[in-house]
Amino acid sequence: MNFFIKSCFLDKEKTDCIVVSVFELSELSDSAIYLDKCSNGHITSLIKLGDIQGKIGDTLMLYKVPKILSKRILLVGCGKKDEINIIRFKKILKNTIHAIKKKSITNIVYSFSNINIDNIYWMIRRMVLSLKESLYETIKINNINIKNTNIHSITLNIIKKNDLFIAKTALKHALAIDHAITSTKNLSNLPPNICNPLYLSYKAQELSKKYENNIVVEIIDIKKMKELGMNAYIAVGNGSKNKPFMSVIKYSGNNIVNKKIIAFVGKGLTFDSGGISIKPALHMHEMKYDMCGAAAVYGTLIMAAELQLPLTVIGILSGCENMVGSHSFRPGDVLTTMSGQTVEILNTDAEGRLVLCDSLTYLERFSPDIVIDVATLTGACVTALGESVSGLFSNNEELSNQLLHASQETDDKIWSLPLFSEYHKELNSDIADFSNIGRGKAGAITAACFLSKFTKKYNWAHLDIAGTAWKSGKKSGATGRPVELLCQFLLNQSNYIYN
């Protein structure tokens, strides 16, 4: 499906459908008023019949409007003009797709006027991403081929010609971010018998072929891990026939404007049974999503390469599988991490932090200025923040504020939680430097405290996305979060100007 930006006369557009906004009390937007005048009041006469009130959720399809070349006009209710926010705007756009996608409509022109969502850049970007999200189809592994929509192209009409340049920039960014989000979702939604640690490494290597001028990939296999002393990482994968692979993706942009080295680490547990501390059977199938952190890092690197960001970015996909087997690590084991610190294992289902701790230590060789790890780490974070908000932890206030700012810009909500010294005491061990799990309280915080012990040499942030990375139930599947947030963080580091 293609997107286009242009400034046009709506009555002259030969298209299948023009979408315009109507507000409460049947107040027409400027675009709707223009079409109404061109049709000699035809739209007003139909609205007077009372079939649309302008409330959010209202839609009315008009056919063969006089003196209008478009085959249809879709009036979309937007509620009260001064109460439209990002959430309502997304709902409005979703309603338009619901009204259109089952019809034989291939080409659409959107002309949304009198809607104030920040500036034209954010208006266009949010439109494109919301429309793409509404049209996303989860990959199904079956022999049924169902076409979800006939839509081939969407044109966004820009009212003011002076806004065309920034609108085209917004479209470029939105399409790159959507590519990142869609790639993340598609990878996350794969079944674990297909997407295993080796498969993750193949996906990483594909990037070095597609973006050969900017991306280099190194794969760390179990032999190399042993040489490096990554014993915690290795231990997690010992129970599985699918051996661990760590993919190191190095992106180098052209004409670099920011000399900082930015690194992302993604937890890539392609399946997590819990190991010997086995999980309950109910919902265990969803543990294929325990690699959503790695998928998010993978997607974010795609965006950087698509937009040729003038940055140096490293992404690590920490691929592993936690299974029950005769070689599985056990509660009571003591592991020596790559950093030399020792960990007493009290629960084998607290495995993500063991994979991440060695990955975080490995990153030291690149002397990164910023490291952000992304992980479906703890159920405790879901208990604390629910399924709408990700947890944020950091050892650096400036980095934390930058992520919070990107969160506000993208409406991908995160919330900062503490790393006070009192929480570190929960990890005390009698026989090792510390244990891999606390005593049952503040689990998301103690998990972050564990990771913080391996991040002393750089500015670090941890995003716990256990509650936000996927949805359960009838419309289950990966959400693609927090990819847009991470992409926005990189755009901000790139000094892009939006207006």
From Swiss-Prot:
InterPro entries in the cross-refs: Leucine_aapep/pepB, Macro_dom-like, Peptidase_M17_C, Peptidase_M17_leu_NH2_pept, Peptidase_M17_N
Keywords per UniProt: Aminopeptidase, Cytoplasm, Hydrolase, Manganese, Metal-binding, Protease
Span of the signal peptide: none
Principal localisation: cytoplasm
EC assignment: 3.4.11.1, 3.4.11.10
Gene3D superfamilies recorded: Leucine Aminopeptidase, subunit E, domain 1 (3.40.220.10), Zn peptidases (3.40.630.10)
GO MF annotation terms: manganese ion binding; metalloaminopeptidase activity
Reaction catalyzed: Release of an N-terminal amino acid, Xaa-|-Yaa-, in which Xaa is preferably Leu, but may be other amino acids including Pro although not Arg or Lys, and Yaa may be Pro. Amino acid amides and methyl esters are also readily hydrolyzed, but rates on arylamides are exceedingly low; Release of an N-terminal amino acid, preferentially leucine, but not glutamic or aspartic acids
Record-annotated membrane-spanning stretches: none
Localization terms from the record: Cytoplasm
Top-level division of the source organism's lineage: Bacteria
Cofactor note: Binds 2 manganese ions per subunit.
Role, per record: Presumably involved in the processing and regular turnover of intracellular proteins. Catalyzes the removal of unsubstituted N-terminal amino acids from various peptides.
PANTHER family the record matches: CYTOSOL AMINOPEPTIDASE, LEUCINE AMINOPEPTIDASE-RELATED
Protein name per its UniProtKB record: Cytosol aminopeptidase
Organism annotation: Buchnera aphidicola subsp. Acyrthosiphon pisum (strain APS)
